[in-house]
A protein has these predicted regions:
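A structural micro-motif
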Residues: 3, 30-32, 80, 102, ...
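Cofactor-binding loop segments of dinucleotide-utilizing enzymes, especially the Rossmann-like FAD-
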Residues: 10, 87, 175
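Glycine-/small-residue-rich active-site loops that bind phosphorylated ligands and cofactors
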Residues: 13, 92, 180
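Short polar/acidic secondary-structure junctions
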Residues: 26, 96-97, 130, 146
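Redox-cofactor binding/interface segments in oxidoreductases and associated redox assembly factors
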Residues: 50-51, 84, 173
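Cysteine-nucleophile active-site neighborhood
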Residues: 56-128
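Amide-donor transfer/coupling interface in amidating biosynthetic enzymes
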Residues: 113-196
Length: 196
């Protein structure tokens, strides 16, 4: 089976996410065709969506201007999986605590932006993530913190604060799972649901 994975390709680690999705698919004997999303009309044909990091205000503006935001909401309402990382999580949230961000409101969380510091304060930490065997090497770069959680399920915490959640078909992380050689977060977000 070949799954079509769409990556919102405004900013962020697009090629790294593509490699992680393809690795996760390959580990299950499947294939993933990766397409970049910069305009409307692509999301409806995707089985999986990735919303990478970058600058949340820039991502939000593109999603609104190109009319991609309603397509992402429809994708989620159809129960199709999404992985939103770092700034992608900020945009996907119910409340980004930033008037410049038009939230998609597909993850019932409130965000505190850049809570883990500036770029120079970046770090890697082993996380126990619900659904994964063994710690995940999470890379935090100017990472947001999930300040409060509504109906979402907390999948991982760092120092007592949520950093990974699942809300229906959406998995959101404060960290960058694509910056490791470990594709288990992509597998957890996508293939456990898409192949079920």
């Amino acid at each position: 089976m070949t799954l079509r994975a769409g990556i919102v390709a405004v900013q962020g680690d697009v090629s790294e996410h593509a490699a992680a999705v393809q690795s996760a698919a390959g580990a299950r004997g499947e294939t993933a065709e990766v397409v970049e999303i910069r305009q409307s009309g692509i999301v409806p044909d995707c089985d999986l969506l990735l919303m990478p990091g970058g600058e949340s205000t820039t991502i939000s503006r593109l999603l609104q201007r190109e009319r991609i935001a309603p397509e992402i909401r429809a994708h989620v309402e159809a129960g199709k999986p999404v992985l939103a990382t770092c700034a992608g999580l900020i945009v996907a949230s119910a409340d980004a605590n930033d008037d410049r961000v038009a939230e998609l409101d597909v993850v019932d969380v409130t965000i505190e932006r850049n809570a883990f510091g500036r770029q120079k304060d970046s770090f890697e930490a082993p996380l126990d993530v619900a659904g994964l065997d063994g710690p995940f090497p999470a890379v935090f770069i100017r990472a947001p913190v999930i300040a409060s959680v509504g109906d979402a399920e907390v999948l991982a915490e760092w120092e007592g604060r949520p950093v990974a959640v699942r809300d229906g078909p959406v998995v959101g992380t404060s960290f960058h799972p694509e910056l490791t050689d470990d594709s288990r977060i992509h597998d957890l977000a996508f293939f456990e649901q898409a192949l079920a």
